[in-house]
Amino acid sequence: TAAAIAYGLYQKNDNTRFLVFDLGGGTFDVSILELFDDILEVRAVAGDNYLGGEDFTNLIVEEFYKEHGLTEESLSLKEKSYYRNQAEKSKCNATEDGFYRMQAAVNGEKVETLIPRGAFEKMSSQLLDRIKTPVRKSLSDAGVKAREIDEVVLVGGTTKMPLVRKFVGKLFGRVPDTSINPDEAVALGAAIQAAMKERKEAVKEVILTDVCPFTLGTEVSVKTENDHLEGNHFCPIIERNTVIPASRTQHFFTVYDHQTQVEIHILQGESRFASNNVSLGTLKLTVPDNEAGKEQI
């Protein structure tokens, strides 16, 4: 929502749909918003917590290692950090002719690796394919098609890459809005949102709604066909894309006789197995001593 505010989406025409494409250094998020009657509503969100600019940097590092006969195992932490920094510079400063030029010293000798634009696009194909999954998921959750999106805005430093901008343009069949520095969009939007909360006259007031980006729930034990208890199951309580703030109630029961303590393991994620989701923390509650299933929380 902060990025959407920074781009002034709340000042657009009613019944307009937007997609915020946020690709940072280590994570990727996509949000679909709709504006109507001065209400900017987040319709759906999706993302990949393990996809970002660092993955593109890794491709350049790997190509440099391959070309100059280096391996991770043969390098010190200082050397690996040095090569990553040089690769990051190469990624951020692609030449006008489309080359990614990484220059660095190997055994005291200055060498370079040149990666043509076409070759880098091919190297990045799997990463770009991973971008499509959250985009499709968010469109499906919002019940809209790509052609029904009126405007696409870019957020996050990695969207500065010509490769990414070209890919987004092809994906939606339109040139994305890059009028604001993607590194500053969220901070700028947060400042405007703060002004709205303070009811500053210079800022148009708009109602903002947001959604829960991941399903929230807890780990539970369930009975198997053999009447045995099996742990590691995830019980959703607040589903992904629920408008927030929100509250839900779910009842749970003790699982064995004379149980006096219950540990609530809170997680976020979409897997039915607790171990595949992200742990947010635990709560320990004391319950009365009783038979299994007699006490509930």
Question: Model-found features: residue ranges?
Answer:
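Oxyanion-binding/catalytic loops of NTP- or PPi-dependent enzymes
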Residues: T1-I297
